Amino acid sequence: MDHFPLKRPHFFFTTAPLPCPYVSGRLERKIVTELNGTDADSLHEALSRAGFRRSHSIAYTPACPGCSACIPVRIVADDFVPDRTMRRIWRANGGLTASKVPARASADQFRLFARYQESRHSGGDMALMGFYDYRSMVEDSPIDTFIVEFRDGDGNLAAACLADRMNDGLSAVYSFFDPDLASRSLGTFMVLWLVEEAKRMALPFVYLGYWIGESRKMSYKTRYQPLEAFGPDGWKRFAPGDGA
């Protein structure tokens, strides 16, 4: 009799419903699973292509009762053409130096992260994070994760982006910047940098997480065209007005 090794079963769980942080009056619930073991990379790749996102060593996707507002989106890097505003933002930040560094938390990063949270999200849970919470967010990753630091000519940290590298693209996990430089549109600049880096690495996509048409914090993502959205028929081109 032939014997075949059995794959270790992978378990998925649903979280308890909580108030949605993006759309007032709705409940948020997620399907989650842990990324661990020797297959963490391959599992993350497969789940990302199915619309999941990563936080720490957890992959998750929304499964909210009576709501499907969260739509996974990704930029088609090779076909992306920045608009006039994006070109201006790129030029305005040309004096910054970008460095890809290992996913290791530093005091310099945390100081900037804390200032950003206090300025932009003072009422949110992330504003309460201490250094060890921040370190966990950065370092608790079982996959290929890195940080891009953007520094000015004096070596001051102006912005940073935590990102994952996958076989088919780069995934923007979290970014933050100096609130005193808000007029420089550094959030947009970091997305543009990831697109250019994906092109340089011959990777087809930049994953941006979820587009939510009813949330100003999340609806901006349709500015990056061409964009693809994940739905029942897989990844399809997605433009402003599609499903909005």
Swiss-Prot record:
<dbReference type="Pfam" id="PF04376">
    <property type="entry name" value="ATE_N"/>
</dbReference>
<comment type="function">
    <text>Functions in the N-end rule pathway of protein degradation where it conjugates Leu from its aminoacyl-tRNA to the N-termini of proteins containing an N-terminal aspartate or glutamate.</text>
</comment>
<keyword id="KW-0012">Acyltransferase</keyword>
<dbReference type="InterPro" id="IPR016181">
    <property type="entry name" value="Acyl_CoA_acyltransferase"/>
</dbReference>
<dbReference type="InterPro" id="IPR007471">
    <property type="entry name" value="N-end_Aminoacyl_Trfase_N"/>
</dbReference>
<dbReference type="GO" id="GO:0071596">
    <property type="term" value="P:ubiquitin-dependent protein catabolic process via the N-end rule pathway"/>
</dbReference>
<comment type="similarity">
    <text>Belongs to the R-transferase family. Bpt subfamily.</text>
</comment>
<keyword id="KW-0808">Transferase</keyword>
<keyword id="KW-0963">Cytoplasm</keyword>
<protein>
    <recommendedName>
        <fullName>Aspartate/glutamate leucyltransferase</fullName>
        <ecNumber>2.3.2.29</ecNumber>
    </recommendedName>
</protein>
<dbReference type="InterPro" id="IPR030700">
    <property type="entry name" value="N-end_Aminoacyl_Trfase"/>
</dbReference>
<dbReference type="GO" id="GO:0004057">
    <property type="term" value="F:arginyl-tRNA--protein transferase activity"/>
</dbReference>
<dbReference type="InterPro" id="IPR017138">
    <property type="entry name" value="Asp_Glu_LeuTrfase"/>
</dbReference>
<dbReference type="Pfam" id="PF04377">
    <property type="entry name" value="ATE_C"/>
</dbReference>
<dbReference type="GO" id="GO:0008914">
    <property type="term" value="F:leucyl-tRNA--protein transferase activity"/>
</dbReference>
<dbReference type="GO" id="GO:0005737">
    <property type="term" value="C:cytoplasm"/>
</dbReference>
<dbReference type="InterPro" id="IPR007472">
    <property type="entry name" value="N-end_Aminoacyl_Trfase_C"/>
</dbReference>
